Amino acid sequence: VDPRGSVSIVDISAGADAATVRTAEFTKYDGMEDELRDRGIRIFGPGASASQDFEPEYVTVSDDSTTAYVSLQENNAVAEIDIESATVTQLLPLGFKDHSLAGNELDASNEDGGVNIRNWPINGILQPDSIGAYSPDGETYIVTANEGDGRDYDGFSEESEVSQLDLDPEAFDFDSIEGVNSVEELQQPENLGAKGVTTTLGDTDNDGVYEEI
């Protein structure tokens, strides 16, 4: 059973004994799964609708207490909620980080004997966890702790390592990867082999072979 995600708004202005509860739901996005995926929002639970796949986690509220922002970590998005009407007003995808670009270097292995910060042909999923809102000069800014997370439970797991993927050797520009000349070398533990990845993305043509990491 995969219950629908929702956000409850509890009003205790009249006292805890007279509390009222309203619920913001995501059911209006059911049937829009492909459109949401095209926008970069991850929906990938087995057989799950959008509302079932969304997993609200941390919440922050604007300075004027009219808007809540909720992290949807596994979905790589933030939901904006109008507090007065208890309505989800928009979904904000956070996108991906291309670690092959200058300025996006990272140390991808803990099995290479030291610190080695460099570019690699992988895309990072931001996946926000805790979240905060700040409003200097009347403009609201959202700050997120992009922790990353994978789903791994009985009956379904997206978690794997680069060494376990069937990579398409024609999809990678080895001329641009210093010291790596083949898929086999790329998948060595001192390179990307031990790097944790999701199996739900990267197989762009659904043939079981991964063109992207």
What role is predicted for each listed range?
Residues 1-213:
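Beta-sheet-rich non-transmembrane sensory/scaffold domains
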